[in-house]
Amino acid sequence: VLQPAPALELTAPIVLITGTSMSSGKTMSGRLIVRLLSQMGFNVVGAKLTGAARYRDVLSYEDAGASAVFDFVDVGLPSTVADPEDFKTRLEDLLRRIASAKPDVVVAEAGASPLEPYNGKTAIDVLGDRVRFNLLCASDPYAVVGVASAFNRQPDLVAGGAANTTAGIELVRKLSGLTAMNLIASDSHQPLADLLKDKLQLR
């Protein structure tokens, strides 16, 4: 039996990680962002908001330094292929649970792609302007254009397979006008940390 969620509102800024497909580098990128923000001294909470139940994804955020982790399974969903209204109610419940962990910042992953039937679009609508930084993990530069054009908000940064080479980064910029970064390369970590601090307005 699910315990009722506390009557709290989540006000912390959110880093939202979306992807063009199921295995596009979201969890690896999320782990890095959790680690960077934790090293800056912030209380980081990790969450997986949509997708299919693979708890190891979100548990790896704990290994990276998150003080707590949450998953849609915590509100009784084995996957988020669900009625959008029911999912919305449960997601709001999940956000109240996340708020109870008193995060300075939330690193949230929307599993699969927002165009797949996992309610990614509903999740983005519910989160609204709490999302201060949107990372799109893409398998290839052409996929960036498809997903980026499907939403009102443009990603702040592109990562994943599309950005693992200089040629890929340049092609992302040429096709979409977006900035891409190879997060596997350690020399990208400081620029990413600076970008996060700026967008999240964390002090």
Name these PLM-found stretches:
Residues 1, 51-54, 60, 84-100, ...:
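Conserved catalytic-core segment of NTP-binding enzymes
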Residues 6-10, 39-43, 184-186, 191-202:
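Charge-biased, low-complexity intrinsically disordered regions
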Residues 14, 69, 180-182:
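Conserved beta-strand scaffold positions in the cores of enzyme catalytic domains, especially
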Residues 42, 66, 177-178:
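Short aromatic/hydrophobic-glycine micro-motifs
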Residues 43-45, 68, 104, 132-133:
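Residues at the starts of beta-strands that form the adenosine-phosphate
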Residues 45, 54-81:
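P-loop NTPase switch/communication element
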